[in-house]
Amino acid sequence: MGKTQKKNSKGRLDRYYYLAKEKGYRARSSFKIIQINEKFGHFLEKSKVVIDLCAAPGSWCQVASKLCPVNSLIIGVDIVPMKPMPNVITFQSDITTEDCRSRLRGYMKTWKADTVLHDGAPNVGLGWAQDAFTQSHLTLQALKLAVENLVVNGTFVTKIFRSKDYNKLIWVFQQLFEKVEATKPPASRNVSAEIFVVCKGFKAPKKLDPRLLDPKEVFEELPDGPQNMEAKIYNPEKKVRKRQGYEEGDHLLYHECSVLDFVKSEDPITVLGEMNKFTVEQDDPEWKILKRLKQTTNEFMACIEDLKVLGKKDFKMLLKWRKASRDILGLDKDEDKGDIEIEPLNEEEQIEKELRDLQEKQKQKQKREKRRKNEEKQKELTRMQMNMLTPTDIGIEAANIGRDSLFNLKTAEKTGILDKLAKGKKRVIFTEDEIAQDNDLHIDENIVIRDRHDMNEVDDLEGELNAMYQDYKNRKAERDANFRAKQARGGDVEDEWTGFEGTKDSEDENNEPKDYIESDDSELSDEDDDEAINQLISKLKSQNNGSKLSSQAKALFSNPLFENVQPILQSKTDDVVDSESVGDATKISNKRSYNEMKKEDLSDSSDEDSSSESDFEIVANDESDGDIDSDYDSDEERKRTTKEKYDKDIDIATVEAMTLAHQLALGQRSKHDLVDEGFNRYAFRDTENLPEWFLEEEKQHSKVNRPITKEAVMALKEKMKALNARPIKKVAEARARKKMRAVKRLEKIKKKAGLINDDSDKSEKDKAEEIAKLMRKVTKKQKTKPKVTLVVAHGKNKGLSGRPKGIKGKYKMVDGVLKNEQRALKRIAKKHHKKKK
């Protein structure tokens, strides 16, 4: 017979066994506590007092003496004797006895343990159920000893075995510790049923319920509750087979009963779940009555033959049939109850009843308020977690205005809802004669007055369309990079800007709406409300009399910085703006404003009609004044500066612009022709008060289609080709850095060559050789490794010994899988910028 191979004590002689021998530990279990300590925050390094229960042979004590601080107290106890260890106190005792407790107190005196370790297991071999209970009982005794000696926020590490008492022990741990985690370190064998539980943050309760540490209470087996038959009826397809044997006194799997018993039973769900079949007694008079029911169909008779194959729909049909049967048989009729006489309450009882009702209502109100606040806090937490940091105080304050106090205009202004109130409906309506009498206006009777409500609806609709279009643009900009680039190049088309402030007369004629409705807040007598009303009226007037600016321009110039700025002159042109006229207008306005400033500064001047020349004769010019006039001493210099400025900004980027440039350069067109082309059907297009989405859509159709030439297209292509041929910024920077390094190396060599040349002790031949040696270092090319050719070993190369045909240089025989792996490794190394060794 052949010799059998030794199994190494069922696999116990693994790598941790040999590592323990190399490190000098007494058992391989030392690596378990090392791995647990590293995983859970190095608690041994912070422990000055450590108790090791069931410590034999002492490997955990060895690890503790190595990792704990110097002069730490380490105590090891076991029922079997142990060899002594340095810096460790060991004694022999049973941890379940009082002798062990007294000896521990004698060694520790007034100290408390920072960490308690337990890696014990009882003697097994009686029976599986007995062994599992004994192991859990030993763990509970170790916990009892740890609770007596642990410090607050201490740590308890114990070994526990998988059994039906595992969850009970975990529940006990959770009552005594802040954090309980189960782990299985790599040093623990997979075939072993052991699990290590790390309990951190000992609560150290002042009064401890003795039932938590009583094995009879902790491991008590509770009777099973009633079987859930509803799951069988309403989810018959989800059947979980539990192989737990027969019930007490019931040794059959097949059960049947009469269908009348099912009708008369108080718990029909249980009957449907337990029975396999309903039998029918044809001679029973009650069945003869139920047989004539319209629900008693052939399908019903087929269903009661085998209840275990029915589905949810069939069970519902049986329950409906039972309800109809009970109605016919009169089983659901309520028994006649006698009239209950209610004694009238006296005055004291009535008062007490009302007080109880009021208290109950108050409690309900407080409960609702508390629930509302909790919901708001929860929403706020969720909003903060999702990084939705938009302030919501305005909405909350506005929601609480009508709840806690009366309406107040001052409060409305503080909360920021004054604008919304200004746009709301008014109640007091005045006639046209009253408005004309107050404002000294003449109103034509033939004017058709539109309904204010309809106008508000139209305004709201336009606002919604504009908001939706803006959202559409934002979403498109997020998705499409070309659209973002187009917006950045062209920008948004703004309305025409006529200055910082418009003339009052034109504003009154053009922008003042005919409002025939006024507010009913005139009866308010409070000073704060009067002040707020005046502010509201002035704000509305400023909004109605605003200049023709876009929303962005209004937001910019509403800054207090622009309050004292005077309006400038600006001529309205459509396509072509004459730079000379703009420059003249700017020059005139600057000089005029400067003269006015000089007039205000002259306090001793009595003649108000004096010209600007007299002002200059009276007041001496400063250096800054001379700078103002010297900026535009020469019109030619100003024109040249303006031309240079605009020449820098011009970029011919379209075919139309290139065609126009060619025509201007060849003399085919003149400046006068360009001015004439500026007057076309689209030049005076009325875009005022039109929505942005409409203008964007019409923009592509509201322009002149200019002809292009083949030469312009080719010239633009050559220009773009030259631009595309340029390297990217990173490549250009890399080349520049490389060139700079080469220049620096050359400068160093020049300095060294100069030093060598100045050395008088060397001959000219030696100098030339050393300089040539330096130059060779600079011009030396880096050696490149020869490329290895990969040859796939299949077909004619399969099993080939020697060099394959047609392969020169170094080669490597690989199969298909290895080739793919090598390529993948190269891709990974290239991706992470690592050199493969």
Swiss-Prot record:
Disordered as annotated region, ranges: 359-381, 483-529, 573-644, 779-808
Signal peptide residue numbers: none
Compositionally biased residues, Basic and acidic residues: 372-381, 593-602
Biased composition (Acidic residues): 518-529, 603-635
Its EC number(s): 2.1.1.-
Gene3D superfamilies, alphabetized: Vaccinia Virus protein VP39
Coiled-coil ranges per UniProt: 345-390
Keywords annotated in UniProt: Coiled coil, Methyltransferase, Nucleus, Ribosome biogenesis, rRNA processing, S-adenosyl-L-methionine, Transferase
Domain of life: Eukaryota
UniProt-annotated location(s): Nucleus, Nucleolus
GO biological process: maturation of 5.8S rRNA from tricistronic rRNA transcript (SSU-rRNA, 5.8S rRNA, LSU-rRNA); maturation of LSU-rRNA from tricistronic rRNA transcript (SSU-rRNA, 5.8S rRNA, LSU-rRNA)
Catalytic activities: a ribonucleotide in rRNA + S-adenosyl-L-methionine = a 2'-O-methylribonucleotide in rRNA + S-adenosyl-L-homocysteine + H(+)
Active site per UniProt: K159 (proton acceptor)
GO CC terms in record: nucleolus; preribosome, large subunit precursor
Molecular-function GO terms, alphabetical: rRNA (guanosine-2'-O-)-methyltransferase activity; rRNA (uridine-2'-O-)-methyltransferase activity
Binding residues for S-adenosyl-L-methionine: G58, W60, D78, D94, D119
Subunit structure: Component of the nucleolar and nucleoplasmic pre-60S ribosomal particle.
Biological role: Required for proper assembly of pre-ribosomal particles during the biogenesis of the 60S ribosomal subunit.
Family, as annotated: Belongs to the class I-like SAM-binding methyltransferase superfamily. RNA methyltransferase RlmE family. SPB1 subfamily.
Record protein name field: AdoMet-dependent rRNA methyltransferase SPB1
Species assigned in the record: Candida glabrata (strain ATCC 2001 / BCRC 20586 / JCM 3761 / NBRC 0622 / NRRL Y-65 / CBS 138) (Yeast)
